[in-house]
UniProtKB/Swiss-Prot annotation:
Catalytic reaction equation(s): glycolate + NADP(+) = glyoxylate + NADPH + H(+); (R)-glycerate + NAD(+) = 3-hydroxypyruvate + NADH + H(+); (R)-glycerate + NADP(+) = 3-hydroxypyruvate + NADPH + H(+)
Protein name: Glyoxylate/hydroxypyruvate reductase B
Family: Belongs to the D-isomer specific 2-hydroxyacid dehydrogenase family. GhrB subfamily.
Cross-referenced NCBIfam families: PRK15409.1
Organism: Salmonella paratyphi C (strain RKS4594)
Keyword Metal-binding: no
Keywords of this entry: Cytoplasm, NAD, NADP, Oxidoreductase
Amino acid sequence: MKPSIILYKTLPDDLLHRLEAHFTVTQVPNLHPETVARHAQAFASAQGLLGASETVNRALLEKMPALRAASTISVGYDNVEVDALTARKIVLMHTPTVLTETVADTVMALMLATARRVVDVAERVKAGEWTESIGPAWFGVDVHHKTLGIVGMGRIGMALAQRAHFGFTMPVLYHARRRHQEAEDRFNARYCDLDTLLQEADFVCVILPLTAETRHLFGATQFARMKSSAIFINAGRGPVVDENALIAALQNGEIYAAGLDVFEQEPLSVDSPLLNMSNVVAVPHIGSATHETRYNMMACAVDNLIDALQGKIEKNCVNPQAAG
């Protein structure tokens, strides 16, 4: 008899068929309490859980006593209570490698769009404001040869450093929990403390997961240390930044502009002051959102769950100690 799983994400037919070859699959729209109650027996017997974006917490786990593995279609897992899974010997799988290059493309796009004011001037053209040769009021700033500061030198940080160093001749500074010798050797990146990075960088790019240590790592003090000409990019997690402090820094001219893919609350409120600022490029968490990469993420998550329920957790496992 096949193990049973809960699937709370719509998958392409070929990936669904791959799952069905190994498991009895119950598809649900979400993990809300009313959904769990409606499918109580399926949740109670499920050994696997696959999906994205929904909260996986102790309350849910209490309804899933047979659960052995959860697979998230994402690299981040701040919506999952990992400690609760580990305590129940449930492994958590994620997709850390397949989205690296695509997210780095997004960060580079935010840097370019923000510096060159692409969104702002495109909207002005559409509004019929281009009635004569443009002047300084339409100008942006250069990207090439500017100093890039990367906060979080993981896979995505490395891919961004590669683009910046080789493509735009940008000196690269970085701050991370530990020095990254490959970044220093390949891109001549310079490790420095956060304060030094903030003071010297023309672009400050944040690519950090959300943890207790990184929550509101960027606040009024950090923005005050940045150059008034600096551009701030956040493509990690929204709550790493105190959004009110960012808004104040932009309003007060403490920094030049911001390119944001993530926010403290998502979707971003239509009342957010960020939406009324011409020096802000705000996009709806599109870091990995290409057809190719999202398919590859789903395929990776499917394979991760198949492997995990066969006892294979050599790669992409967040908490391998849970299998001990």
